[in-house]
Amino acid sequence: MNGQVIKTIGDKYLVKNNLGKTYSCRLKGNFKIKNIRSTNPVVVGDYVDLSFDLKEIMIVKLLPRKNKIVRKSVNLSKRTHVLASNIDQALLIITLDEPVTSRSFIDRFLVSAHANNVNVVLIFNKQDLLSKELLKKQAFLKKVYQKIGYRVLCVSFLNDDLSMLKEIMKNKLNMISSHS
């Protein structure tokens, strides 16, 4: 049987099959050493094959990914850290104040997403906190990213903008990310 990983906690994986039933699973012992160049071989979004043992349910095979979001592993320079896979879109939450999301963080995220065939929606949050100067900076960044093909939204989640976000996410497997 196979299913999709919907949650990971330590060495436990929650996998949902196509009938909607969920299973708590672990990785088969030798799974982690099979030519995998990432720090985490199985991530949320992965499709996996399961084996039912008398004691527990094991993930025995990782099925091919249609896409993934990766970052460089912090301590292991030649390895990557996969954040999610098989996603329909990534939502990158950006703040220009309290705290500031750096332009380099945004660009690194976009490069990784583009290289791995993931659509990204940029969401500038905390509109209610922005000064006139920061609103100008946001307008500039919005124009830059729209010009190169990204959908950009400016919101304040304190207001009624959550309904807009729910509509964007509707019927899609989404990854939400920010700098912290």
Give the ranges of each region predicted by the language model.
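Cofactor-binding loop segments of dinucleotide-utilizing enzymes, especially the Rossmann-like FAD-
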Residues: 8, 95, 125-126, 157, ...
